[in-house]
């Protein structure tokens, strides 16, 4: 289930990034349509000049903000994928602490629960590493 959600999220982010590129290209063309007649002394009306100019000026600013937000979201996803590494470290520390406490009490140490959990986390970390590299390519 987690694999499918990562796949869908990756696909959605990739499509969004592609749409932002297309929008930037479109805005550049619209801005060019206004600038070229100005240099050719065709003297377009003010309305024909102002609206595309505003789009040409404000459009890239809007796209820049959207791209920054998208990159911030991708970095957040990468950080979430990295959290499992921290959980694994925490689990290993808990296991070592429990082993030390049991040894102090001269009891046998049963670490099968921790071993099972550590194996589970290692599998998740391996899967997350794959998705982490895919999401990093979007940045």
Residue ranges and their predicted role:
Residues 42-55:
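Hydrophobic alpha-helical transmembrane segments
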Residues 61-78:
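Transmembrane-cytosolic junction motif
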């Amino acid at each position: 289930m987690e694999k499918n959600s990562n796949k869908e999220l990756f696909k959605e982010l990739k499509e969004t990034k592609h749409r932002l590129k297309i929008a930037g290209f479109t805005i550049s063309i619209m801005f060019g349509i206004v600038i070229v007649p100005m240099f050719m002394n065709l003297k377009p009306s003010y309305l024909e000049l102002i609206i595309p100019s505003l789009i040409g000026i404000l459009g890239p600013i809007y796209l820049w903000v959207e791209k920054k937000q998208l990159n911030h979201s991708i970095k957040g996803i990468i950080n979430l994928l990295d959290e499992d590494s921290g959980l694994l470290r925490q689990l290993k520390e808990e296991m070592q602490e429990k082993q030390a406490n049991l040894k102090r009490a001269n009891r046998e140490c049963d670490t099968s629960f921790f071993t099972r959990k550590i194996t589970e986390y290692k599998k998740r970390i391996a899967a997350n590493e794959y998705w982490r590299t895919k999401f990093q390519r979007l940045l």
